[in-house]
From Swiss-Prot:
Gene: whiA
Annotated function: Involved in cell division and chromosome segregation.
Family to which the UniProt record says this protein belongs: Belongs to the WhiA family.
DNA-binding region of this protein: 277-311
Keywords per UniProt: Cell cycle, Cell division, DNA-binding
A family per Pfam: LAGLIDADG_WhiA
GO molecular function, one term: DNA binding
Protein name: Probable cell division protein WhiA
GO aspect biological process, one term: cell division
InterPro entries named among the record's database cross-references: Homing_endonucl, Sporu_reg_WhiA_N_dom, Sporulation_regulator_WhiA, Sporulation_regulator_WhiA_C, WhiA_LAGLIDADG_dom
Gene3D superfamilies assigned to the protein according to its UniProt record, in alphabetical order: Homing endonucleases
Amino acid sequence: MVSYASDVKKELTSLPVHPEHAKAELAAFLRMNGVLSLHDHQFSLDITTENPAIARRIFSLIKTAYGIEPLLIVSKKMKLKKNYQYLVRLQKQVHEILSDLEIFDSDNGLITGIPEKIMTSEQRAMSYLRGAFLAAGSVNNPETSRYHLEIYSLYENHNNDLLKLMNSFFYLNAKATKRRNGYIVYLKEAEKIGDFLHIVGAVNAMLAFEDLRIMRDMRNSVNRLVNCDTANLKKTANAAAKQVEDIQLIEKKVGLENLPEKLAILAHFRLTHPELSLKEVAAQVPDGPISKSGVNHRFQKIREMAQQLKEEN
């Protein structure tokens, strides 16, 4: 079964790759998922995924941004589900590209934060967030789970920079927390999750999210009303049962004919209509209609008389 998060990523990978934004999106992929290794006496940069659409996206980003076609290696995992694994391997201009994307500094040291040119450009920020979500993001199905979207980071300062991007440019009210093996930024508000999906370009997924959210909220509202009605019915039934019990006690001990006329009329009516609510009794009692508070006052008098009879025994 395809998950909602998979649908979101499928839509994002189908978006056109714009040359002016490709580097920002690629920078997120390489910074978050890239692995530098040595093959055949030369450095290579590998990105591994089980999603073929994401592999194609990375391939297109590298080709668009730098005019280089990386290797695309497909293998089959031998454990568990035996899924296919896709490896995108960059072997040319590795150091130059990592330096250009500000993942390496001038001494070839790793820069774990997000470059200033992305932190100060709204359009680049949108592209970077798209790449970050594709690389290490997830979102719950709004129909069946609590509202939650998150992006994982290995490094704390990268996580903090993601938080700044999401809040300073787009006012998403994102939060950050530490996980056992890293850090996450996350969204819990349904409206903000919808905004994020729109920002990164998943417009269809955003519309589907809003539809599912509205349906879920409507169901919750209906359930609350049903629960409220059920509680009110139960309360009405319990109150009526106690009133009938009091009236039957009075009838047995002294007879209803010895009650004041208004109380006797109400007592007889309640015995024949135990299912009616207080409001319905007030409207239908033979000497009425009277106010709901008036009916309640009469039942209170009956209650006091029944209580007195119990105490006498």
